[in-house]
Amino acid sequence: MAALSLKGIRKSYDGKQHVLHGIDVEIADGEFVVLVGPSGCGKSTLLRMIAGLETVTDGEIAIGDRVVNALEPKDRDIAMVFQNYALYPHMTVAQNMGYGLKIRGIERATIDSRVAAAAKILELEPLLARRPRELSGGQRQRVAMGRAIVREPSVFLFDEPLSNLDAKLRVQMRLEIQRLHARLATTSVYVTHDQIEAMTLAQRVIVMNRGYAEQIGAPVDVYEKPETVFVAGFIGSPAMNLMHGRLSEDGATFAVAGGGPALPVAGAPGIGTTIATGRDWVLGVRPEHMTPQPGVAQASLPVDSCELLGADNLAHGRWGNHDVVVRLPHADRPARGTALGAALPAHRLHFFDPETGKRAG
């Protein structure tokens, strides 16, 4: 195991336009970090640079006490798990898991021992004699993880490993990856576009956008205190409600742009200090914080539709030219055309600068 250091990492393919812009992060020995963001944000490129599959234009990558910029992937002491399982169809599970060690010249007894240990961890022991075509998608992904485990690397790299699995298997494999990390405590970097994977697996999340690390922090901190409009809108399902508008001179109301209502926002932390009154802002509030509750300021939301999700419902409406979503308990399902008293708890309101996109306060 080893710490992983990324200092000033930049990537350009043509020497002019950069696709990664000065990524700086220190990943502790044994830490599980998730790179999350939309397609094209640079997360997979960064992972490939750590692996040695892409060159570093500027900056330094260190694994443990070794700078690895100039090292081949095989010399970096890393193991990768890919979206595609990349199993040899003519080999058994045991042969697939041990093949990487075999071509490195590791003695047979050591290979057998490591394969047996990994198979026990991943509950693959009954499947060792089978070939990939005889396995389910989840079993194949466990074999791919087993192949990485037997290398006993300093760093695990996961490149969207659950993307090919159905929803039920993704939940199962997330739990298995959590248990695996708890048992092995190996430094891990995991790439995904799925925020649920990011929030449930990570000790720290790096939210990527257009080649920048928009925010780095514990999942709960990123969720509860997003630093930019992008993070606020990307993390969370459904996303945070974001509304452009103007804060009144007395800081008591927020007039939603596009003919929306004047929302009661008095008492929100920072108003009058870090949040200047009498100017434009982007107001954010999460759907679950708008659930009607006694003693909390409310605003009327005309309901356009209501989605039944099982344990709860999502009521949809509009304020001005902004779509608004409110999460409701299972028993509350307002009909189309009715008015919902959407809560606006002052301590749950977020304000962002409309020009820079950065959080106020």
UniProtKB/Swiss-Prot annotation:
Q: How does it sit in the membrane?
A: Peripheral membrane protein
Which GO biological process entries does UniProt record here? carbohydrate transport; glycerophosphodiester transmembrane transport
UniProt-annotated location(s): Cell inner membrane
Query: Which major enzyme category is it?
Result: translocase
Record-level GO cellular component terms: ATP-binding cassette (ABC) transporter complex, substrate-binding subunit-containing
GO-annotated molecular function: ABC-type glycerol-3-phosphate transporter activity; ATP binding; ATP hydrolysis activity
Q: Where is this protein chiefly located?
A: membrane
Keyword annotations for this protein, in alphabetical order, are: ATP-binding, Cell inner membrane, Cell membrane, Membrane, Nucleotide-binding, Sugar transport, Translocase, Transport
Q: Where does ATP bind?
A: G37, P38, S39, G40, C41, G42, K43, S44
Q: Which Pfam families match?
A: ABC_tran, OB_MalK
EC annotation from Swiss-Prot or TrEMBL: 7.6.2.10
Residue stretches making up the ABC transporter domain: 4-235
Report which reactions are catalysed by this protein. Answer: sn-glycerol 3-phosphate(out) + ATP + H2O = sn-glycerol 3-phosphate(in) + ADP + phosphate + H(+)
Q: Which SMART domains match?
A: AAA
Family of the protein in this entry: Belongs to the ABC transporter superfamily. sn-glycerol-3-phosphate importer (TC 3.A.1.1.3) family.
Q: What does this protein do?
A: Part of the ABC transporter complex UgpBAEC involved in sn-glycerol-3-phosphate (G3P) import. Responsible for energy coupling to the transport system.
**Quaternary structure per UniProt?**
The complex is composed of two ATP-binding proteins (UgpC), two transmembrane proteins (UgpA and UgpE) and a solute-binding protein (UgpB).
Q: What is this protein called?
A: sn-glycerol-3-phosphate import ATP-binding protein UgpC
Q: Which organism is it from?
A: Burkholderia ambifaria (strain ATCC BAA-244 / DSM 16087 / CCUG 44356 / LMG 19182 / AMMD)
